[in-house]
Amino acid sequence: MKKLTIFMAILLMVISIPSFAQDKTEKPKEAIKPALLVIDIQNAFLPRMSPDKEIAMEYINALIDLFRKNGYPVIRIYHTSEEYGVKPGTEGFEYPETVKILPTDPKVMKTYADGFNKTDLDRVIKATGSNTLFLCGLSAVGCVLATWIGAQNSDYKAFMVKNAIISHNAEYTKNVEQMFDAVTYDMVQLIIENSGK
């Protein structure tokens, strides 16, 4: 019986060696190619946001500066809605003049919370060559969250940026930042400045 046990142990080891060897094979890591998604910081929606929106706007502008300085795309996303009267060409549709976007930044318009749903956002991102997305804007509990999920479903690495997302309730925003592991500005800066462009 002892010989049979030893034989079975040796046989099990021999059989499992190829599977262990296969598990050790490393896939080459894809280089980080970041893009910033600035979501829905439109004049019609900002008055409904919590008072921490002023701090968030500072972070959003700092992120725009960081991405632009390092040659990475800033993609602006706009929500259009008949219900809320947010139509292209109206003041409510536009971003505040204090936001450092440029007319040359790619622009995507959406009618659903998820920026990927029935839009050309995926095509726009692919055209920039980006594979890693950093999200800022509003609402943390609405369009930012839905677009983060859409990015995950579209096989992008996606991160919300802490203090650069806002909602109508600051506590809800903090909960989203915690639940979805929002990254800090300093972490984004570290990634951007070391991503090899």
Labelled PLM ranges:
Residues Q42-R48:
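Short acidic, Gly/Ser-rich segments with clustered Asp/Glu that frequently serve as metal-coordination loops
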Residues R48-D52, V86-G89:
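Short, solvent-exposed loop/turn segments at secondary-structure boundaries
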Residues M1-L4:
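Positively charged n-region of N-terminal signal peptides that target proteins for export
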Residues I41, H79-T80, N163:
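Active-site loop/turn elements of alpha/beta-hydrolase fold enzymes
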Residues M49-F67:
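…and closely analogous acidic/polar surface helices at protein-protein or active-site interfaces
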Residues A21-P28, I32-A35, A62-D65, K87-K197:
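Active-site-adjacent betaalpha module
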Residues M8-S16:
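Bacterial N-terminal signal peptides
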Residues L66-E83:
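Von Willebrand factor
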